[in-house]
């Protein structure tokens, strides 16, 4: 039986900032873009969450909810450095590490003989070493597969471990909300609710044919996950070809100036996503896509020099967006 651990750092960016500046401890802290530039919150600590602040919220709204919020500009180089240190700790227990982002990863510790081969004890040891050596906390989920390990890591946050043993899987998934299943967003959840499904137990009662009829191939996957079955291996390499962010506006942007004003918010979200991906990812070009009111679209791109020019250059994105906007009349 496999022993999979999903490790997830608690409020990673904010925790690193509090480590660097202990005076921030106990105060509401968020990392994100400037409110004046329509920035968004990348993450916030638990003190800020008490006021309703959360990631992906506009910085302006966050400051309305919590006027005393300390908003810090992201330091991606620092976060990547801490992420490398985090992975060095993981390597003490296994080489089978699948990074999902800077602050989370899957570990297959099935062959690890440390701590009597106990996945729970290994997870607790990792948490202790991270706290003692890096000055931040992580939460861990231990289970026979990746799906359940990821669900479990969120169960005892912050700074906790939750274990789903093989013998407990059946009882655990019966009451698990279908919203916890990967790939089930609001739209899919509503479609399932119309079928009378709110929990994995409800999902188990539906015939596979019904699920395939309504959800195609994903219906088979839903059926497996509802039973707590996930055979995906921990992959030590993940190839990412691109990273992007886009937004569809309720009203068409009126002109070139409006398009350029929309860039900072998109760049803040892109920065947040970029900072979370593997430290091995290297950006080689920037691109901007603009879709017009008639549903035609155009894309402009520009390579990033090998000289080390930062991948994020606001002026470049402004210029590309403006040039793309002017193409609509051609």
Enumerate the language-model features and the residues they cover:
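DNA-contacting surface of Y-family translesion DNA polymerases
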Residues: 6, 180, 193-329
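Gly/Gly-Pro- and Ser/Thr-rich, intrinsically disordered tail segments characteristic of DNA damage-repair
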Residues: 1-214, 218-221
């Amino acid at each position: 039986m496999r022993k999979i651990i999903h490790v997830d750092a608690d409020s990673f960016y904010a925790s690193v900032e509090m480590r660097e500046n202990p005076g921030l401890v106990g105060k509401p802290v968020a990392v994100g873009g400037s409110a004046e530039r329509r920035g968004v919150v990348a993450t916030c600590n638990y003190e800020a969450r008490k006021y309703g602040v959360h990631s992906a919220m506009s910085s302006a709204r966050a400051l309305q909810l919590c006027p005393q919020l300390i908003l810090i500009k992201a330091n991606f180089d620092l976060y990547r450095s801490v992420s490398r240190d985090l992975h060095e700790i993981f390597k003490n227990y296994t080489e089978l590490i699948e990074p999902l982002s800077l602050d989370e990863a899957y570990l297959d510790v099935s062959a690890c003989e440390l701590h009597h081969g106990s996945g729970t004890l290994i997870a607790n040891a990792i948490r202790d070493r991270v706290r003692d050596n890096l000055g931040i906390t992580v939460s861990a989920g231990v289970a026979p597969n990746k799906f359940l390990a990821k669900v479990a890591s969120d169960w005892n946050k912050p700074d906790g471990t939750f274990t789903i043993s093989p013998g407990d899987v059946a009882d655990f998934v019966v009451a698990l909300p279908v919203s916890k299943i990967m790939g089930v967003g609001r739209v899919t959840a509503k479609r399932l609710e119309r079928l009378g499904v709110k929990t994995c137990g409800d999902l188990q009662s539906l015939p596979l044919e019904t699920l395939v009829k309504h959800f195609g191939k994903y219906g088979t996957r839903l059926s497996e996950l509802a039973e707590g079955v996930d055979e995906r291996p921990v992959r030590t390499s993940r190839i990412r070809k691109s990273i992007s962010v886009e937004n569809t506006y309720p009203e068409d942007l009126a002109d070139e100036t409006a398009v350029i004003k929309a860039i900072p918010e998109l760049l803040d979200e892109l920065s947040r996503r970029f900072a979370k991906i593997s430290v091995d990812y290297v950006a080689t070009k920037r691109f901007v896509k603009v879709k017009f009111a008639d549903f035609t679209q155009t894309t402009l791109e520009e390579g990033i020099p090998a000289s080390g020019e930062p991948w994020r250059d606001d002026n470049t994105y402004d210029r590309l967006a403006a040039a793309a906007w002017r193409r609509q009349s051609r």
